[in-house]
Amino acid sequence: NDLLKVCEAKTVAVTEFMAIERFSHIMHLVSSVEGTVLENCSTVDVFKATFPAGTLSGAPKPRALEIITELEPSSRGLYGGVVGYFDFAGNADLAIAIRSAFVRDGIARVQAGAGIVLDSNPDSEHAETISKSASALRAIDIANSLKPIGS
């Protein structure tokens, strides 16, 4: 639905469906959807149409975002947002900010989530969030064990 706002409808296609990608602490099912951007749409238009990513918010996205606002006690901050750049040639290289540690005033914050669907098991979803946050938590643990040079 997001790409149909900024792409030629007949060009929008699933080019990869539920491929398994393995990472150090988790596995992901990955699907790719591509389309030819409309001539009157810029890179920023594509960004605005596709973020926040439905994979993190749920669907239908407008209602899912309302529910998130109603239920979650605090803002997600950068989690689920975007890290990257836009250049003057109209290119962009962006990544969704997940499984990251955000540090402010010496305090690190790690957020992780799981996809809740009809047959979700709460214990399994909780275990998934622990697995997803493990790398960032380990990095914080290592950083806290380091001593400044000369100490």
How would you label these PLM feature ranges?
Residues 1-6, 20-23:
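Short acidic, Gly/Ser-rich segments with clustered Asp/Glu that frequently serve as metal-coordination loops
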